[in-house]
Amino acid sequence: MTSKINKIVNGPIPDSFLFDESKRLDSLKFDGTNLEVLDQLLLPHEFKYIPVEGVSDAFAVIKSMQVRGAPLIAVVGSLGLLLEIQKASELDSESIIQKINFLISSRPTAVDLRNSLNGLKPILESQDYSDVVKLEKCRSYLLNVYTDEKLQNRILVWNAYQELLSAFPDKEKLTVMTICNTGSLATISWGTALGVIRALHSENRLKLVYVLETRPYNQGIRLTSIELLHGEVPFKLITDSMAAWAMKNHQVDCVLTGADNVARNGDTANKIGTYMLAVLCKHHNINFYPVVPFTTINKNIATGEEIKIEERPSAEMLRVNGVLIGNSECPVWNPAFDVTPAHLITKILTDFGNWPPEMLEQQIPK
């Protein structure tokens, strides 16, 4: 799959680019037969890796948001299924398809998980292979989800970094704003938007990052801040409601976000609050860039109107670390995502090039 979609901007990528992995936190540990994931609900107070032994465990850690981030949950779901298939002595296609659908239901908005797991179905439904060959092909495919993510993430970060150099040729260092967590805790490599920020810092092209706390789940303050502290990246944490004032009073050059689901026309679903940032960027004439791997493109939907928005429990808004901060009887609306319309997006930065939204559909690899 990777060879079909690679489009490296201003390549080749130098070996020195983001070579120091000691500055990176690891979201999981996998040795081929054992999988452990970092329990992100315990961060920043405790770093604890918990075992994932199969599909049920993978579903649980994804559903509970012990792991989160579209690329990461795709890998965890795939490896959870791989661990079960590795133990199987014979193929049970119907059971595997049931497990695929079960895993996909854990986070319905995040398309990476769906895209990755649905890629198994043509193998299972093929009449060209014996059951023994199908089983081996399934194992190989699921392992490749893990290995491909590392390769594609490096290309994605490089391409996006090159776009920023081109967009701001007269600026030595950039001031960037971001939301949620899109770094190594959301992927198995450097990350999407935060990976680009880490690249800017490593190349001495970053002045400052404004990090939104990202209510109600606080991924900015709990996760992004510890990644940036660990990497010694200059940043300031702000509340979500401070974004407009920060844009007005400080020179924010661009906003970089991740994405969980991108329609063919470029409409982009991401963490709730992203649409707000895009509207503010339009008003303040600031570039707005989603940083998006190929696996996040949803070729099955034409516009953002078709994206199903997950709604989370009211307790996630009313409680912080288990402590009730509002009346337990408060009525709550808690969508996990919003959709930014394509016309508010400067470019969508991908591992197959950097594209204005209106050009995305014709550039999506087949």
UniProtKB/Swiss-Prot annotation:
Family, similarity comment = Belongs to the eIF-2B alpha/beta/delta subunits family. MtnA subfamily.
Repeat keyword on record: no
Q: Which residues form the active site?
A: D260
Enzyme Commission identifier(s): 5.3.1.23
Report whether Repeat shows up as a keyword of the record. no
The job of this chain, per UniProt, is described as: Catalyzes the interconversion of methylthioribose-1-phosphate (MTR-1-P) into methylthioribulose-1-phosphate (MTRu-1-P).
Q: What is one cellular component GO term in this UniProt entry?
A: nucleus
Please tell me where this protein is predominantly located.
cytoplasm
Q: Which InterPro entries match?
A: IF-2B-related, IF-M1Pi, IF_2B-like_C, Initiation_fac_2B_a/b/d, M1Pi_N, NagB/RpiA_transferase-like
Q: Which Gene3D superfamilies match?
A: translation initiation factor eif-2b, domain 1 (1.20.120.420), Translation initiation factor eif-2b, domain 2 (3.40.50.10470)
Molecular function via GO: S-methyl-5-thioribose-1-phosphate isomerase activity
Protein name per UniProt: Methylthioribose-1-phosphate isomerase
Q: Name one GO biological process term.
A: L-methionine salvage from methylthioadenosine
